[in-house]
């Protein structure tokens, strides 16, 4: 007998190069990471969503009962709970020790301060190339739009599309408070 696929709606904040979108999306037991990494679909469907320009994030330009986003255009996805990511086996494989690395990430539009959990020693080339999954999981995230400081997104967990990365700085402990 085939087991039914468990599905649930989860709230998520999507950032593209020009828009801030908040809505709910239907995910299976593989969570948001499974949805974003599904090679059989190039889009994400949102329900009960609102869209704002990053220039004025407090001014909603559109409410929609259904909206579709192209996965390749999603810079990052903010989630309210780490459980929404999905299976930890998708996020990381094996039984290795995971270390926390404070990082500062820049994209053409956003600056992100977060904690990257990574197995083993921090090596930028491995972080950027490991696996076929384009999304990195970041924790305790603070995101601002460089040119539009009114946009300020703080979330416990975020999936970041590494295709949009301009720079990544491993912030040494103790140096985080400087700035």
What residue ranges belong to the model's regions?
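Conserved RNA-binding domains used in RNP assembly and mRNA/RNA metabolism
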Residues: 1-179
């Amino acid at each position: 007998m085939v087991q039914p696929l468990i599905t649930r709606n989860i709230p998520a904040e999507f950032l593209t190069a020009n828009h801030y979108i908040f809505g709910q999306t239907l995910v299976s037991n593989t969570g948001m990471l499974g949805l974003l990494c599904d090679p059989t679909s190039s889009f994400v469907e949102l329900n009960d969503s609102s869209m704002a320009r990053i220039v004025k994030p407090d001014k909603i330009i559109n409410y929609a009962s259904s909206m579709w986003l192209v996965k390749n255009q999603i810079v990052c996805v903010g989630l309210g709970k780490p459980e929404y990511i999905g299976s930890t086996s998708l996020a990381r494989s094996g039984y290795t020790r995971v270390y926390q690395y404070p990082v500062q990430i820049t994209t053409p539009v956003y600056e992100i301060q977060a904690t990257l959990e990574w197995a083993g020693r921090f090596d930028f080339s491995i972080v950027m190339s490991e696996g076929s999954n384009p999304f990195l999981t970041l924790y305790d995230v603070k995101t601002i739009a460089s040119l539009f400081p009114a946009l300020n997104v703080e979330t416990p967990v975020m999936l970041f599309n590494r295709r949009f990365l301009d720079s990544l700085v491993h912030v040494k402990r103790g140096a985080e408070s400087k700035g």
